[in-house]
């Protein structure tokens, strides 16, 4: 597995860790994940998924992201956060000759603020910006989720929306004039976008501290993304399942 593909597991790891996290402070596990890319002639990728989660009064860590709490009580949690964004484009991974002539888009580290409010279900929002001078973009995620528990089974459906700044979209989905001349694709300069999504996590606890989990997310891509000549899908998605142990 290449380094860049391993980094693409970040969102799966973070989601899986959150789904598997129970009453304990430290969770370890392993599973498998499938990522569906929106890029033209990109196949779905199947990866092994390590799950790591830690929670304390001052710090938290889930997958490839973590944070420091500025405020942490029963109903409200505000934290400074940083995480590795798994978005990337590797020209050689596409079967399209035109796509193979485009520039590489790199993954990056995003940093910002995260807030969770939990009286009725829970509201989750994060705003973060690129720190490595790759896209110089900003991403804002807002979601509402409701946790339903029946015995050892916990289901958490959610609905949300993701906003990408124009810099973010231009870096990952835009085609420069230089790339257009080299590849034969039309040039494209997208604006900012709103991308709604649905997600579902399931966790079943057995034998005390052991659990099996499943997580999935479906994102409907906006016209600013689907109009890109780099894209041939109207959606992106991920799914993961595995087993964990909570200490």
Q: Positions of the model-derived regions?
A:
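Repeated loop/turn-to-beta-strand initiation elements of outer-membrane beta-barrel proteins
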Residues: 26, 58-61, 78, 121-125, ...
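Extracytoplasmic loops and strand-loop junctions of Gram-negative outer membrane beta-barrel proteins
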Residues: 32-35, 94-98, 126-127, 180-186, ...
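Short glycine/proline- and aromatic-enriched beta-strand/turn motifs that initiate or cap beta-hairpins
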Residues: 21-69, 77, 167
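Outer-membrane beta-barrel transmembrane domain signature
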Residues: 67-70, 131-133, 137-211, 215-225, ...
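Outer-membrane beta-barrel "beta-signal"
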Residues: 49-53, 234-247
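Transmembrane beta-barrel architecture of outer-membrane proteins
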Residues: 47-49, 63, 106-110, 137-141, ...
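Cleavable N-terminal export/targeting peptides
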Residues: 1-25, 41, 207
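Transmembrane beta-barrel strands of outer-membrane/channel proteins
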Residues: 28-34, 63-65, 80-86, 125-129, ...
């Amino acid at each position: 597995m290449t380094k860049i593909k391993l980094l693409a597991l970040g969102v799966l790891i973070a989601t899986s860790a959150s789904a598997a996290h129970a009453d304990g402070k430290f969770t370890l596990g392993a599973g498998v994940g499938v990522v569906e890319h929106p890029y033209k002639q990109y196949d779905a990728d199947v990866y092994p998924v390590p799950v790591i989660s830690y929670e304390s009064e001052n710090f938290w860590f889930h997958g490839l992201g973590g944070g420091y709490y500025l405020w942490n009580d029963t109903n409200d949690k505000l934290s400074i956060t940083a995480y590795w964004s798994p978005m990337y484009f590797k020209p050689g991974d596409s079967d399209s000759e035109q796509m193979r002539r485009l520039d590489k888009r790199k993954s990056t580290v995003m940093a910002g603020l995260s807030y969770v409010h939990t009286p009725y279900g829970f509201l989750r929002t994060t705003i973060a910006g690129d720190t490595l001078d790759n896209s110089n973009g900003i991403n804002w995620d807002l979601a509402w989720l409701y946790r339903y528990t029946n015995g050892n089974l916990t289901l958490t459906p959610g609905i949300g929306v993701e906003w990408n700044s124009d810099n973010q979209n231009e870096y990952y989905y835009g085609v420069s004039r230089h790339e257009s001349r080299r590849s034969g694709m039309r040039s494209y300069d997208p604006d900012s976008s709103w991308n709604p999504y649905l997600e579902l996590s399931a966790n079943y606890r057995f034998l005390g501290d052991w659990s099996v989990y499943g997580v999935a997310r479906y994102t409907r891509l906006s016209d600013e993304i689907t109009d890109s000549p780099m894209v041939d899908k109207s959606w992106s998605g991920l799914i993961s399942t595995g087993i964990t142990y909570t200490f």
